[in-house]
Amino acid sequence: ITNGQNADLILVCCKTDTDVQPAWKGVSIILVEADREGYKRGRNLDKVGLDAADTSEMFFEDVRVPITNCLGAEGQGFIYLMSELPQERLGIAIGAQTAAQRAFDMTCTFVRDRKVFGKPVMDFQNTRFVLADLKTKLQVGWAHLDWALARHMKKELTPVEASGAKLWH
């Protein structure tokens, strides 16, 4: 779980009504305090990237919380989570697009400065072909991201459209 080592309050999505169908119904979001009996932090997990925030194991053994620790209406947790999904996916797309742009900019600097056979790598025709292709893909990505952001700001971005933004990037 992200920031598990530092969290004072943990949001747990769990099934609180096992009789209701379909399965996504009956899921609630429960707040669990880090000092609650039965809760224990585990180890930090090794990850590839995104090291600014830890990712930790968490253990819950017979943890009991009062009904007042239910965030929102009982059984509506999945609906709450899904209502935020487009924004979450859009955030991932923004991060990917900006990282791609930075990588492209760094590559352009490198091929301008790096010399091979007495001339900059930028002067080779194939390098220019590849950079032109990458720049075009970046431009399409920015245009798509602008479109998705505009829809999000109007509260019109659907989960499917947000998935497309994430997929592209």
Regions found by a protein language model. Give the residues of each.
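Flexible, small-/acidic-enriched active-site or ligand-binding loops
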Residues: 35-66
